[in-house]
């Protein structure tokens, strides 16, 4: 049996500081409702109800509600149905879904209605995740791993001065310019995580490979919309990577990594913002939904997209921050001492396109 992962998040902001924002919380379990309300009360105006009917009445009668937090399991209807009806009243209201159940069971409705913030309940860690999610959704300030680990100190490095040991609470940052650099960094980082934190090298290398592959091969395109560093095979539905790649200046991406207590942190930031919330939910759905004819994942033979599913399965937490057409940040957390049974879905998207 796995024990729940301990919280990576420390309190941030000034104690007692009130942030503009009114939140409607829908939770029928009194102890959970009180815990969430008390946790958010110092910064937000929180109105709490226990039923979907009361929630819809509040939304109709209180036009200044800025955000809805709802449990999935409610007396009259589930939280997804409440979210759908809430959007009819308030089309642009941000919605956070919370649950004690396996999010994967609801992947059909998640994809259909574009729910992108689903947090599983697992103690204090989920409370901090809710607080950070609320802050990001209301402020629009979505980028930065320091929102989750405020104690991180950032330091820039290159391959030439790659650290022999990763200092605790230091976020190492480097720019990736070539295919060779990507490979060297992936190997060195994964090996150091194994040596220092006993993290499975196969897992961290898979994560690093996946997040940097998207930044290097799929994000950069030319004026015609074709991939700059991959070529489609004319005989098969596969993409072939160019050899000895040197990225153009505008395509170079940032890789960040480090350790903080029992946590391993990996972040990749590209300057293109081509990944979308719709694509992420679609790919998760493809790999979580069985083909009725084979019983295997529907996306098993897709030419791409499996990496998003693999990342979420391997990591303790996975966060996508997207400013469409400008920037994508993929944040990966891996706990080296404990596991989290059910995984969140966390996709933030600013659409400037």
Regions found by a protein language model. Give the residues of each.
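The feature encodes the CheY-like receiver
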Residues: 75
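Short amphipathic alpha-helix used as the core "switch/output" element in two-component signaling
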Residues: 57, 80-92
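Active-site residues of response regulator receiver
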Residues: 71-72, 99
């Amino acid at each position: 049996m796995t024990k729940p992962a301990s919280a990576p998040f420390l309190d941030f902001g000034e104690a007692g500081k009130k942030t503009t924002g009114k939140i409607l919380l829908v939770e029928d379990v009194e102890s959970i409702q009180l815990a969430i309300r008390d946790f958010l009360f110092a910064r937000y105006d929180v109105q709490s109800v226990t039923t979907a009917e009361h929630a819809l009445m509040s939304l109709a009668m209180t036009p200044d509600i800025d955000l809805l937090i709802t449990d999935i399991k409610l007396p009259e209807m589930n939280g997804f149905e409440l979210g759908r009806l809430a959007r009819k009243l308030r089309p642009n209201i941000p919605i956070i879904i919370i649950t004690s159940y396996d999010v994967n069971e609801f992947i059909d409705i998640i994809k259909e209605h574009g729910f992108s913030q689903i947090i599983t309940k697992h103690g204090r860690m989920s409370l901090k995740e809710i607080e950070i999610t609320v802050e990001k959704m209301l402020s629009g300030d979505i980028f930065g791993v320091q929102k989750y680990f405020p104690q991180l100190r950032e330091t820039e490095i290159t391959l030439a001065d790659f650290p022999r040991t990763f200092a605790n609470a230091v976020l190492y940052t480097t720019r990736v310019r070539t295919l060779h650099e990507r490979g060297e960094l992936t190997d060195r980082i994964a090996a150091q995580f194994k040596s220092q934190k006993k993290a499975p090298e196969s897992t961290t290398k898979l994560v690093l490979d996946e997040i940097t592959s998207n930044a290097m091969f799929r994000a950069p395109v030319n004026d015609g919309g074709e991939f700059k560093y991959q070529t489609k095979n004319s005989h098969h539905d596969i993409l072939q990577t160019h050899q000895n790649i040197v990225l153009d200046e505008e395509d170079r991406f940032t890789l960040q990594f480090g350790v903080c207590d029992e946590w391993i942190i990996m972040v990749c930031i590209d300057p293109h913002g081509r990944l979308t919330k719709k694509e992420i939910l679609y790919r998760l759905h493809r790999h979580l939904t069985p083909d009725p004819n084979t019983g295997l994942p529907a996306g098993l033979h897709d030419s791409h997209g499996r990496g998003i599913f693999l990342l979420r399965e391997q990591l303790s937490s996975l966060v996508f921050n997207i400013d469409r057409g400008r920037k994508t940040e993929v944040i990966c957390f891996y706990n080296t001492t404990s596991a989290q049974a059910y995984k969140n879905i966390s996709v933030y998207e600013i659409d400037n396109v």
